[in-house]
Amino acid sequence: MRMPSAISIGVFAGLSLAASAVPSLRKNGTTCTVIPLGNGQDDVPNILSAVDECGQTSGGRVVLPAPYTYRINQRMTTHLTDSRLEIGGTLLFSDDIDYWVNNSYRVDFQNQSSAWRITGHDYVVDGGPHRGGVDGNGQLWYTWAKGGSNVFGRPMPVHVFESTRATLRNLAIRQPQFWAVLVDSSSHINLDNFYVNATNHDSSVSPEGEWVQNTDGIDTYRSDHITITNWVYQGGDDAVAFKGNSTNIHVENVTVYGGPGIAFGSLGQYPDRTDIVENVTVRNVRVQPSFQRAMNSGVYFKSWIGVNYGVPPNGGGGGHGYVRNVSVENLRLKDVQLPVYIDTCLSYLFSENITQYCDTSTYEFEDLHFRNISGNGLATVTDYPGKNISFAVALLCSEKAPCTDLTFQDISITLPGNYTGKHVLCENAEVEGLPCNS
């Protein structure tokens, strides 16, 4: 995005200082415009008032214009019906970690939480031509979590919840506290032209200073008919992830810098739940490392061990369900550690002896089709429980639930010239189009 000139920065400063001299909420017909209060004051009450006045009226508009920055000092739910929320400016979440840990909305998955819920129907959230959006103040959270996985209390900045027939577009999410976007219990949602960037600047967080775990770009959960197009993601975790009961999903034109790429999962974590992921198309995706984070994989599938060991978020397992009717097309790889793989031995209890449960999963993967995948792998992954999986493709399916109907067409993945191992590993997998274990 083009940086503002010195003149525009000066204008911004003047507008910010003068904000208190003009009404912070102005209404003109069915359009409500919010001007920030400034001086670190909470803008949530005025934003919610604008939504009440203009966001629930047919044809209504709530406008948060550029170049303003709006302070989000408390959780908020914006309920929109037949209206538009235009975010030309930036929603900046406060640095009050104690508040967010204790007051964010709870999410019914892995004891997670969110800071901003968007609910309703037939609405548009638009960042405009310069991509307004969100600043999650994420560095505070990356340092606070200090490399821990799924640390309780880190809220997601954008939570599309119980929404139908909605479009979110032209949005930038910088430094998200946790996952950038969660689409949850929703249907017929279009998300187009997003930029997500999670970058750690604190070298004390990990030896390499690269830690940006749990900063997914977007996750879908209990949602149907979701379209994700024209995304750029830079971070350290899944760019796009499909959680349980994500159906009829279309993903196209996604560029990924760093992290594990496109993820199906995690799935089967809860023994009392059935997780279904079905009818998913992923097309035209490019993946490569960022300046800070390796590219772990291009596309991968992950289900939990088949016994319930430990408790969520990092333990669990024994759940049921299936991934079915998936098409992955036109995947371009650059310097990817493990381009394509299936993992049915998932647990985040790394200090435990999980290898004894690696063939216990009854979660099913079937009818998965891969076409036109090219680029290079690094053959550097060695940390799968009890195995070296330095391959281009590793399909590690459970003995209790073999993977069936996996097809590959036009696959061209090169490995380093000095690599002498196998290129493809198949365990308990019915595969067509690839020479298994060769």
Curated annotation (Swiss-Prot):
Signal peptide annotation: 1-21
Functional summary from the UniProt entry: Specific in hydrolyzing the terminal glycosidic bond of polygalacturonic acid and oligogalacturonates.
Recorded family membership: Belongs to the glycosyl hydrolase 28 family.
Any single biological process term in GO: cell wall organization
One GO CC term, this protein: extracellular region
Protein's UniProt name: Putative galacturan 1,4-alpha-galacturonidase A
Listed EC numbers: 3.2.1.67
Enzyme category, top tier: hydrolase
Intrachain S-S bonds: C397-C403
PbH1 repeat positions: 186-222, 223-244, 246-266, 277-303, 323-344
Principal subcellular localization: secreted
Glycosylation sites: N28, N102, N111, N197, N245, N253, N279, N325, N353, N372, N388, N418
PANTHER family given in the database record: EXO-POLYGALACTURONASE, PUTATIVE-RELATED (PTHR31736:SF12), PTHR31736
